[in-house]
Amino acid sequence: DYILIDCMPSLGMMTINALVASDTVLIPVQAAYLPVKGLQQLIRTISMVKKRLNRKLTIHGILLTMVDFRTNYAKDIASRVRETYGSKISIFENVIPLSVKVAEASAEGKVFIVIVQMEKYLWLMKI
């Protein structure tokens, strides 16, 4: 069984508490310069939490999100993440593509599941 703790993109007390309570971390990273730059600080924070507060904490992998492979920029960012972190941390081959449907679902408080093989979206109401 898995319990997902979805944290805000900050390194505040709530995120630290979530890391202390977790066994593993899945790191979603938006395919853009600033989120990738913040990834380094997050990895340092995870390392600090592991060293001082939660020795069993591991990084499950990095998942690229909001990827628009029509642009060279997104390809460059994805490549940079793989080159920089790929030897130390698993980088998922599948990505979450840039989609207005995802933004609309978030604004409406809905949960979404991307089924990559079928290239369709399955929408679920948030409970």
Locate the predicted segments by residue.
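C-terminal boundary of histidine-terminating zinc-finger modules
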Residues: 105-126
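Short, glycine-rich, amphipathic interfacial segments at transmembrane boundaries or analogous
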Residues: 98-104
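Residue-level recognition of oxygen-bearing side chains
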Residues: 10, 101, 120
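Conserved catalytic-core segment of NTP-binding enzymes
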Residues: 2-97
